[in-house]
Amino acid sequence: FLIENLFCEGEMNLTYSHIDRIIVGGVVPTTQPLALMAGKALGVDFFLERRELGAINIGGAGKVIIDGEVFEIGPREAIYIGMGAKSVEFTSDSVETPARFYINCAPAHHTYPTRKITQQQASPEKLGNAENCNVRTIYKFLHPSVLPTCQLSMGMTVLEPGSLWNTMP
């Protein structure tokens, strides 16, 4: 399905899918931190009370502050936040080149530790060929070969120069 206006500066935009109970979102903090808020729709006291979250930064440098602990998340880096984190805030290091956090959040049944994942730590998989203009690398940030999660997997595709398209991972 199509989610429009996912990355708007100074905003957190979340979409809940009833199909998998997944929440997809874009977070672009500028002058103020942007915090996850539970709301009545989730029926919990705090956003990650029964959920886990992954965030990949596709923008400038930023930070994720989890229960007071600061994680510096640079471009093309990710963070996994385990179930039970009570406070989560996103910030950017620069208003001119803000962080752009792509997030996925899924129900969880177990708590795994919060962890930052660099692009070097992600599991890369090269796919495609030049003849079909789809040479690309999928960096698996949240994947069983990288770290444990309840059910959340996340990656980022990087197209090589001259490549024009990607398939669904």
Where are these regions (language model features)?
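Short amphipathic beta-strand/extended segments with alternating polar/hydrophobic composition
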Residues: 35-37, 72-76, 115-117
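Long alpha-helical, hydrophobic tracts
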Residues: 42-47, 69-71
